[in-house]
A protein has these predicted regions:
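Acidic catalytic/metal-coordinating carboxylates
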Residues: 34-37, 60-68
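The C-terminal output helix
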Residues: 121-132
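Active-site beta3 strand of CheY-like receiver
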Residues: 45-51
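Alpha4 helix (beta4-alpha4-beta5 surface) of REC/receiver domains from two-component response regulators
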Residues: 63, 77, 88-108, 117, ...
Length: 132
């Protein structure tokens, strides 16, 4: 059975492109358009990996990661998180790396716009890491 990946992003173009890239590699993809919907889909679908945009309405990626640290979500602790970010400036990148890496316990990040090869490589690495 194909691994299931949850993609959470408020940009429909990013959702469509990411879905197309991942499905071309044999992954099953489920999507959500904001953090609140993303948490609901996480609970309903129990994916093998979550790809999460940082900047979204209702609840952003930081909020989702913080929520997942609550003991109520402990069942999903082993679900790898790949962050999508538009953060480019050095100061913003340092803040991002500190907040997400140290505080929010994410596994990796990728900058937008992303190349399909980079996305596939990062996803494959995280999926294989979870399997082992």
């Amino acid at each position: 059975m194909a691994e299931k990946i949850l993609v959470v992003d408020d940009d429909p173009d990013i959702l469509d492109a990411t879905t197309m890239i991942l499905e071309s590699q044999g992954y099953q993809v489920v999507t959500a358009r904001d953090g609140i919907e993303g948490l609901a889909v996480l609970k309903a679908e129990n994916p093998d990996l979550m790809i999460l945009d940082l900047m979204m309405p209702k609840m952003d990626g930081f909020g989702v990661c913080k929520e997942l640290q609550d003991p109520r979500w402990s069942k999903y602790k082993s679900t790898p998180i790949l962050i999508l970010t538009s953060v480019r400036e050095e100061a913003s990148r340092r803040r991002y790396e500190l907040e997400t890496g140290l505080e929010l316990d994410v596994d990796d990040y990728i900058e937008k716009p992303m190349s399909p090869d980079t996305l596939i490589s990062r996803v494959n690495t995280l999926i294989n890491k979870k399997k082992s």
